[in-house]
Amino acid sequence: MGSLSIWHWIVVIAVVLLLFGRGKISDLMGDVAQGIKSFKKGLQDDEKTAEKPDAVKSLDHNATTGTPPNRTDVGSKAV
């Protein structure tokens, strides 16, 4: 009882054709195809316009500056 036979599918297709008609179904399928094409084109455009990340800048940790960094102890109290 739970499965649909070929006759069930034929009846369902016949009812759909009677309700919507051949013209509306073909128009609907054309709109779906056009939407899929637009979606794929949008995905391709996004890949083309994606910017490359900037080059990684490295810092020289051994470089000395004229003034030492300002270091304060957070937990210490001034005496």
Curated annotation (Swiss-Prot):
Residues 42-60 have a biased composition (Basic and acidic residues). Residues 42-79 are annotated as: Disordered. Signal peptide: none annotated. Disulfide bonds: none annotated. The chain crosses the membrane at residues 1-21. It is a single-pass membrane protein. InterPro entries: TatA/B/E (IPR003369), TatA/E (IPR006312). The keyword Lipoprotein does not apply. It comes from the Bacteria. It is found in: Cell inner membrane. Its main location: membrane. Residues 61-70 have a biased composition (Polar residues). Gene3D superfamilies: 1.20.5.3310. Keywords: Cell inner membrane, Cell membrane, Membrane, Protein transport, Translocation, Transmembrane, Transmembrane helix, Transport. GO terms for cellular component: TAT protein transport complex. GO terms for molecular function: protein transmembrane transporter activity. Part of the twin-arginine translocation (Tat) system that transports large folded proteins containing a characteristic twin-arginine motif in their signal peptide across membranes. TatA could form the protein-conducting channel of the Tat system. PANTHER family: SEC-INDEPENDENT PROTEIN TRANSLOCASE PROTEIN TATA (PTHR42982:SF1). Belongs to the TatA/E family. The Tat system comprises two distinct complexes: a TatABC complex, containing multiple copies of TatA, TatB and TatC subunits, and a separate TatA complex, containing only TatA subunits. Substrates initially bind to the TatABC complex, which probably triggers association of the separate TatA complex to form the active translocon. This is Sec-independent protein translocase protein TatA. The gene is tatA.
